[in-house]
Regions:
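Non-catalytic accessory segments flanking enzymatic or RNA/DNA-binding domains
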Residues: 1-158
């Protein structure tokens, strides 16, 4: 008895996902420094190292370094699930951190995914994102932030 790829994915995740979307992706945080500006960029990628190289190539005046990727915490997901996690976490980040574009007038490529560190450290940022992910993973029926018990209306979750 053989199991097709579609059947296997349905059995594992309980999701009906097109085979074109059966790719594993992960989330990342890049620290970006230019003169006195320090920001971080949060997003998802199929290959974080390739994304890091592309960002460095596009933003040559910025010093860019990876400070976290989800696979280091043994977390990576199918592309549609990663996209949902990314959207929800961006929503929480907008409540917690100042958007880069709200503080500075320049518009580097990808500025919509950039946040100002403010008073927070790299570790605070990483821990906050990991905490958000943990809440999402512990509640598999969560479809939005209101479904997540500990994050509901709590912009200062750290």
């Amino acid at each position: 008895m053989t199991t097709t790829r579609k059947e296997l994915i349905t059995k594992i995740g309980g999701l009906d996902i097109p085979s074109s979307k059966l790719k594993i992706s992960e989330l990342y945080i890049f620290k970006m420094t230019k003169d006195t500006r320090i920001a971080f960029k949060f997003g998802k990628a199929l290959d974080v190292e390739s994304r890091l190289k592309a960002v460095k190539k596009d933003l040559v005046e910025w010093e860019v370094m990876q400070i976290w990727k989800s696979s280091l915490s043994y977390m990576s997901w199918l592309e549609p699930q990663t996209s949902e996690y990314e959207k929800l976490i961006h929503y929480v980040l907008k409540m917690k951190f100042t958007k880069y574009a709200d503080k500075y007038s320049d518009r580097p490529r990808g500025y919509t995914e950039m946040y100002d560190f403010g008073k927070f450290t790299e570790w605070d940022t990483r821990d906050f994102i990991e905490q958000c992910l943990q809440e999402l993973i512990q509640n598999p029926k969560a479809r939005n932030l209101q479904d997540i018990r500990n994050l509901r209306g709590n912009a200062n979750a750290i």
